[in-house]
């Protein structure tokens, strides 16, 4: 008989935790990033653990809040505020008010592990809540950055309206993100524009086509540019940009930033009657925009997993004009310089920049690349974990760990 060897792979579940300054209350969350699937949003499922004989008749409350900052703190004068803070959900966690609560798998495992002093809670995002976005501040900005942030707060008090003491309260910053659809589709975005001249016959034709409609963060954009010069003017050079468009709905403000660019004179000058065809490649990423004011991110640059803010998606039947918060979109812009008297010829081709959906091959590939690039960080984090072999649960302090964090 040939002996059979079975290899069992045990996958540890990472759980994030944060404890109040007095060490009496600890909050556990299974994740920090919650995904908007358009038809539903991942629930915020967590556990609160309270030390024995600490409450003495008091209660533990929790709430989900969002902070929408659309103006600088330095400009807030004479009582004028450029921020809106809204409580999206609030409930009493300890003692529980619900007779029976449906638990998620991670809550069941944590309840079993943490014992009788563990109490579950669940919050839900409203259907129209915006995604998390942070606008990169400038060098002179001293206050909090503009953007949309979410947090889960728990505190100890006698009633829900009581703010609670800082020593018995804990706040956990979370993010609400959107992922790309499971399939990207076969549509190839394109644009065709022409430019005529007042005192000259003929036109310059510019056609730009992208190789796909949806790109994942870190992927290379390929733009096929075709120029036909049927005029008497000459094309001096070509500029290609990836443009990030931001709309701050609260104040109806719109602005754009270049997150990737190149300029070339290859094939130039394109003289009358000539044609030019070339594929240009650009990679928009947060790492190349560290010093750019106003760039929209899905976190902070000090976090190693930060990306450019994803394109804003809306559910079927709705328009992006119905979105609230900070609406993000992207386009690839090609600009031709036709000389001093000829002016410029420009066109924009819109596309979407998103995270790959969980379970897709692109998602697995992205996770593998990210893991390879952060081996040292992983070793650092592993030294900070407290693992449990019985339940395969790994606890990590909720604060984002950084290799270069000062002591």
From Swiss-Prot:
One GO process term, biological-process aspect: G protein-coupled receptor internalization
Keywords associated with the record: Sensory transduction
Keyword Transit peptide: no
PROSITE patterns (alphabetical): ARRESTINS (PS00295)
GO molecular function: G protein-coupled receptor binding
InterPro entries: Arrestin (IPR000698), Arrestin-like_C (IPR014752), Arrestin-like_N (IPR011021), Arrestin_C-like (IPR011022), Arrestin_CS (IPR017864), Arrestin_N (IPR014753), Ig_E-set (IPR014756)
GO cellular component, one term: cytoplasm
Top-level division of the source organism's lineage: Eukaryota
Protein family: Belongs to the arrestin family.
PANTHER family: ARRESTIN, PHOSRESTIN-1
Protein name: Arrestin homolog
UniProt source species: Locusta migratoria
Lineage: Eukaryota, Metazoa, Ecdysozoa, Arthropoda, Hexapoda
